Regions:
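Catalytic-domain carbohydrate-binding cleft regions of carbohydrate-active enzymes
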Residues: 1-210
Length: 210
């Protein structure tokens, strides 16, 4: 930013890289870049990012759904710089995790602690309408990730994740690959859940999918 003589008081909004195959659908280069993009929010004053988890295309690096990108960037500017209220909050991002038996329960930022009448809560939405949440993986101490079952705890905006193959889970990932069509979690205000991982395992041992 300093290289371009960026004015620190000027708002700066940017877009999450959209899902695409890149070097391969199941490889992890994209979510690692997304991690860096969200870390940058803490380093860039007056910044915001528009999520695109739901807008990717496996064969086109420039996805066609530009309207949603423009709207999400506009929501950031209208809320932060013009004081407009009643707009969708930024996309939910992973905050914390706790264990409950053989399940891991996740909490998120950018959502109210209690959803009022289902507003600002999680939903899973696919081509045919509402469906079960997908795109989650879970691992134990062996660091081997398995497809996971996820359930919404609607009234406190948490997500519960488990797998019969992982009796002692320690880590969860969501949409943590270059292209993950199963990732379908949104808010009722139309914002997609941002890809995340709860682990901080070394990047040269980033896990396998079985």
């Amino acid at each position: 930013m300093k290289l371009y003589h960026f004015e620190e008081k000027k708002p700066f909004y940017y877009t999450q890289l959209a899902p695409y195959r890149y070097e391969g659908d199941t490889l992890r280069s994209l979510p690692l870049v997304i991690e860096a993009q969200y870390r940058a929010l803490a380093e860039i004053p007056h910044s915001g990012i528009a999520a695109t988890t739901d807008l990717g295309n496996p064969t086109c690096i420039h996805p066609a759904r530009k309207r949603e990108v423009g709207e999400r960037l506009a929501f950031l500017a209208l809320a932060n710089d013009y004081g407009v209220t009643g707009l969708p909050a930024p996309a939910p991002v992973y905050k914390s995790m706790e264990r409950d038996g053989n399940k891991l329960v996740l909490t998120f930022d950018n959502l109210p602690v209690r959803a009022q009448n289902g507003v600002d809560s999680f939903v899973a939405f696919g081509p045919e309408g509402y469906c079960r949440p997908g795109g989650f993986e879970i691992a134990g101490e062996d660091r081997v990730f398995h497809p996971a079952v996820a359930n919404f705890k609607y009234w406190d905006n948490r997500i519960e994740v488990s797998s019969d193959r992982v009796p002692d889970p320690v880590a969860v990932r969501y949409a943590f690959r270059n292209y993950c069509p199963e990732a379908n979690v949104m808010t009722t205000m139309g914002q997609p859940l941002v890809p995340f991982r709860t682990d901080d395992w070394p990047l040269d041992d980033i896990g396998r999918i079985r």
